[in-house]
């Protein structure tokens, strides 16, 4: 099992698909990485030699992935919350940020329904 950017890459998958297991690398980026490294996107990871895996490592190292990217996203959200702007307030309250309706739906973001206790 190859290890790229601190992530174990599955051996049995095609290179393009296997690279998507790295946080911050999607299908398009994976194709670009394979093209830049000169590695076939359809070759399986187990069939690649050490030199090809090293080329992939070098290409991924040029990108902002995994911990650095997660940290940046977290800091961006924290910055919005500290500013007190509309998006920051929505993040703070745990509500949808991008204008979705909340009268109905939005249960994923709002959490389970809290029942109203009947008063006697």
From Swiss-Prot:
Q: Name one GO biological process term.
A: translation
Which Gene3D superfamilies would you find in this protein's record? 1.10.8.50, 30s ribosomal protein s13, domain 2 (4.10.910.10)
Q: Which domain of life is it from?
A: Bacteria
What are the alphabetically sorted keywords of the record?
Ribonucleoprotein, Ribosomal protein, RNA-binding, rRNA-binding, tRNA-binding
Renumbered residue ranges of the record's region Disordered: 94-120
Cellular component aspect of the GO annotation: cytosol; small ribosomal subunit
Q: Which GO terms describe its molecular function?
A: rRNA binding; structural constituent of ribosome; tRNA binding
User: Which protein family is it in?
Assistant: Belongs to the universal ribosomal protein uS13 family.
Q: How does it assemble?
A: Part of the 30S ribosomal subunit. Forms a loose heterodimer with protein S19. Forms two bridges to the 50S subunit in the 70S ribosome.
Q: What does this protein do?
A: Located at the top of the head of the 30S subunit, it contacts several helices of the 16S rRNA. In the 70S ribosome it contacts the 23S rRNA (bridge B1a) and protein L5 of the 50S subunit (bridge B1b), connecting the 2 subunits; these bridges are implicated in subunit movement. Contacts the tRNAs in the A and P-sites.
Q: What is this protein called?
A: Small ribosomal subunit protein uS13
Protein source organism? Methylobacillus flagellatus (strain ATCC 51484 / DSM 6875 / VKM B-1610 / KT)
């Amino acid at each position: 099992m190859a290890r790229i950017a601190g992530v174990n890459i599955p051996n049995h998958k095609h290179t393009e698909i296997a690279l998507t297991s790295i946080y911050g690398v999607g299908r398009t980026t994976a194709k670009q990485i394979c093209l830049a490294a000169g590695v076939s996107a359809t070759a399986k990871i187990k069939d690649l030699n050490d030199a090809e895996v090293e080329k992939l490592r070098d290409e991924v190292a040029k990108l902002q992935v995994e911990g650095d990217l997660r940290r940046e996203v977290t800091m961006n959200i924290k910055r919005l919350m500290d500013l007190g702007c509309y998006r920051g307030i929505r993040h703070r309250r745990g509500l949808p940020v991008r204008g979705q309706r909340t009268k109905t739906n939005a249960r994923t973001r709002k959490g389970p329904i809290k029942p109203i206790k009947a008063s006697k």
